[in-house]
Amino acid sequence: MRKTGLMLIAILCLFLLSRLPAGSCTVFRLKAGDGALIVGRSMEFSVDLKYDVIVVPKNKAYASPAPGGKEGLAWKTRYGYAGMASFGMDYGLSDGMNEKGLAIGVLWFETDTKWQDVAPDDSKQALAQTMLGDWILGNCASVDDVKREIQNLKVFKHADPTLNFSPPVHIIVYDATNGCIVIEYEDGMCKIYDNPLGLMTNAPRFPWQMTNLRQYVGLTSETPGPYEIAGLTFPATGHGAGMFGLPGDFTPPSRFVRLAALTRFADKQPDAERTLNLAQHILNTFDIPSGLVKDTSPDKKTVTKETTQWATFRDLTHRILYFKTYDNQNLRKIDLNRFDFSGTSVKRIRMFGISEIVTDITDQAH
């Protein structure tokens, strides 16, 4: 039964590959007044990918395949980490953070991604693209580490063994010193972009997204004063007129612009706790309820509905991962400082189906 279910999901995912958009993930960073860094991220998809949180210890052995059935890169994790993995797997992270405060976000990338070729003599450097996020968290403590160490890899196109296709993705990486980069693969080359804004959505490529922001330099949080034309006075119709023209749809370019405006103008908060609250408010504006974004197969029989399956908030400074899910908007907390990352087994934390969605405070009346 489980095998049949996974096969059906694979068929749906293959269908999604041929149509746009397939995922509307959104990620951003906020800095508190005391320097604490909070990263917020939403995960949208049209298929239930059966996510759990996995906790991976130090010295956990991993091995990548290589093209042609050869053995690829093998490594043991230097750092323990926690992140979101699908279908019961202990790799293939979409999101996560390690004990050094390094965090990744793996986002769908609707463009002409071309991974690296692997020469016969380079098999031991070959890393399946589905394992890149795991490799980063397990081996790197900073953005500079990633920039340096990734040059030794050959990241190749590899079909996910569960879904039977190779997801087109790009990756954003944050560290606890406010570093941030975007990694995209184009024409078989690894392109790394410094990302001082700390924002990313999906397609087009990151440099295009940054250039597109120039179209919106007139956005402001200030309500404009009245205009006088031909002796007539025209005041703004209401507060918020300074944001007129801010795109409100769910396409990746529009979400990128909206992120830039919200993170630019929202009041900076003094500490991690209140910045976490601000991050929730910002990410709420990108939430996709079921039915709002649909895709239909050519035979009009299959409709996929993209939803915000889960959202994460990572405190890079204090090494705390928070998350909420579509079925339960209550925030849950995972403190990486409390884990003993020794041992070799991967632990799991269930994300969905957790009760106590509503807190009854009736009896607190006095």
Predicted regions: what they are:
Residues 143, 147-185:
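Aromatic- and glycine-enriched pocket-lining scaffold segments that form the walls
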Residues 38-40, 103-106, 172-174, 182, ...:
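Structural recognition of the beta-strand scaffold that forms the well-ordered cores
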Residues 23-37, 46, 149, 158-159, ...:
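C-terminus-biased signal that marks the final domain/tail of proteins
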Residues 45-47, 110-112, 188-190, 328-331:
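Short, surface-exposed beta-strand-loop junctions and turns on beta-sheet-rich folds
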Residues 9-18:
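Bacterial N-terminal signal peptides
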Residues 1-4:
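Positively charged n-region of N-terminal signal peptides that target proteins for export
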Residues 23-124, 153, 157, 360:
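A contiguous strand-loop segment
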